[in-house]
Amino acid sequence: MTMDAFSNPAARIGFGTLDLLQATEYPMTRMTQNYQLLTSLYRENWIIQNIISTIPNDMMRKWYDLRTSVAPEYLKQMTQLERRTQIRKKLLLGMCWGRLYGGAVGVILIKGHNDMSQPLNLDTIMPGSFLGLHILDRWNGVYPEGELVTDPEDPDFGLPMFYTVRNDETGTMVARVHHSRVIRFIGRELPWMEQVTEQYWGESEVEAIYEELTRRDNVAGNIAALTFRA
């Protein structure tokens, strides 16, 4: 095995020297796991707010254009259902919290489906029984379980089979939800091992730009401070 590298010990540059560039490291921070920092950044920084919300807002702005031969009265009923369940807003929130925290879910609520640990059977959904989506971010009481989907024909192959929804204040389990009743929203895709580390969620969109953001804020703050001394 051969390796090529540049080195100039006299000038202290290149491989194996005391060059300042050689001291640069990229430690694994996993900032996505810092809920308090992400929340604080989102609430206080307009740049972060725009990074999180711009793409979801663009995706949802025109909603959808349905071309069908279905009778107009049925289309009206569907529009009324969308308004009643606020499905457009719920999907927007799911995408935003997925981008901010790296993961969120939308639990599909169906009237009469009390045992949510059972797979969702579309044939058993009666007209008017859709109750909407319940959005939970990854820090809001939803926990992927260790059992994974093993059917390669399933769209969720390799992802958790069940999700536990808990009341974190009391520690009690609210529901055990089958993956077919869950819509996943994640941030940036991660390599497999990192995905496992993040409990099968993704990476926050904030993590990749955090260092640049701190540089910008520090420079802007210093410039503002200098105006008082001018």
Language-model segments: residues:
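Glycan-recognition surfaces in beta-rich domains, encompassing non-catalytic CBMs
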Residues: Y64
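Structured, contiguous alpha/beta core segments that scaffold functional sites
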Residues: M1-S53, P72, K76-A230
